[in-house]
């Protein structure tokens, strides 16, 4: 993974963890957890693609990888919708910047996961 992406994930997660949104903190904690899981999934998928010999073993070992991939895209779409929802409600510039950057990062990660998945197919 590119070091800028790692920094972006860490920066966004750190800033989100310090926020107190008007919505419940449970919602924000859920978003943070999903961001962390998405980062781990993206990293592992990218590593599998980089080790071309592992592609066939990944497909053989994990017959449900396409289902997992579909689930991750659903999670990304949910996170994008949540970020957009927060952006429409907040007037706090710190929150706006954080969630705009989170939205941009989600779109980049979605594109990268699509690229990785096409290489796996």
Swiss-Prot record:
It is found in: Virion; Host nucleus. The keyword Transport applies. GO terms for cellular component: host cell nucleus; virion component. Pfam families: Flu_NS2. InterPro entries: Flu_NS2 (IPR000968). Keywords: Host nucleus, Host-virus interaction, Transport, Virion. Average number present in a viral particle is estimated to be 130-200 molecules. HAMAP family: INFV_NEP (MF_04067). Belongs to the influenza viruses NEP family. This is Nuclear export protein. The gene is NS.
